[in-house]
Regions:
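Positively charged n-region of N-terminal signal peptides that target proteins for export
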Residues: 1-4
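Active-site neighborhood of phospho(di)ester-bond hydrolases with catalytic His/Asp-centered motifs
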Residues: 32-34, 86-93, 124-129, 192-193, ...
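Extended active-site neighborhood of metal-dependent phosphoesterases/phosphodiesterases
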Residues: 98-205, 210-215
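His/acidic metal-ligating clusters that form di-metal
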Residues: 60-87, 172-176, 183, 188-241
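Short, solvent-exposed loop/turn segments at secondary-structure junctions
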Residues: 36-38, 94-95, 131-133, 195-197, ...
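Bacterial N-terminal signal peptides
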Residues: 7-16
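N-terminal active-site segment of His-dependent metallophosphoesterases
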Residues: 17-103
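Short, flexible/disordered intra-domain loops and linkers
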Residues: 41-51, 99-106, 137-147, 228-241
Length: 241
């Protein structure tokens, strides 16, 4: 039976992970985070700051890992330096809902790219969150503008590399899905967008084919049993609330 590891998290969160690769016992190292929510203000280190400042502080901690030794706890790589990560993962909610006082997804995506591209040398893998897909799924108030696809289109362009890049105007929420995978050191890493719905699960089955041996690590923003407010209304005008 294929080994499947599902990484599902909510809230702002960061952790580093080490795992023994299937090939020659090599140790894989990656950093995972989610829900950076550019555009919000929150209390951080005793004062109210923008989430972009929090993200830059988090990115600074990534660099500290290169010289940080793993705990002497008999775990994988115990006592050795973490070193440079093989890759970094962020599972969405890069932008935030456009309530009054919160910046647009256009500005948030620009800030994210500026901060992360200048700080990370390892490959960066992304999937969108619910706030990227509609910019405000689950938010009951009227938004202005109703939608801003900047972060959704940006993630799609980076990860899917279409022949023609999507723009805010051309991005299609129904068809422009983010899903991809790669195998590294005998482990398959699979990225299934915001939520592993029927479409994503069908793609997953096609992607792995008859491979029942390679271990799988799965990244998605929402768990299979997801919050219904994160989805479009199937009735009426098919609005986001």
């Amino acid at each position: 039976m294929r080994k499947l590891i599902l990484l599902l998290f909510t809230g702002i969160l960061l952790f580093s992970c080490t795992a023994v690769g299937a090939d020659e016992g090599r140790i894989l190292r990656f950093i995972y985070c989610s829900d950076v929510h550019y555009g919000l203000e929150r209390e951080f280190r005793g004062k109210e700051v923008g989430s972009d400042e929090v993200s830059r502080a988090m990115l600074a901690t990534f660099k500290l890992l290169s010289e940080t030794r793993l705990p002497e706890d008999s775990g994988v790589g115990a006592g050795i330096k973490f070193g440079s990560p093989d890759f970094v993962v962020c599972t969405g909610d890069i932008a935030n809902r456009m309530e009054e006082g919160v910046q647009s997804a256009t500005t948030s995506w620009s800030q994210f790219c500026s901060d992360w591209d200048s700080s990370i040398s390892s490959p960066l893998y992304l999937v969108p969150g619910n706030h990227d897909i509609s910019n405000a799924i689950g938010y009951s108030k009227v938004l202005s503008p109703e939608k801003d696809a900047s972060s959704a289109a940006g993630i799609f362009n980076r990860m899917m590399r279409p022949a023609v890049e999507r723009t805010v105007e051309t991005f299609n929420y129904q068809t422009d899905k983010v899903h991809y995978s790669f195998v590294k050191d005998g482990v398959r890493f699979v990225f299934m967008g915001m939520w592993p719905d029927a479409y994503m699960r069908q793609w997953f089955d096609q992607e792995i084919g008859t491979d029942t041996i390679t271990p799988v690590v799965l990244f998605t923003h929402d768990p299979p049993i997801a919050d219904t407010k994160h989805f479009t209304n199937p009735n009426g005008k098919h609005t986001i609330n």
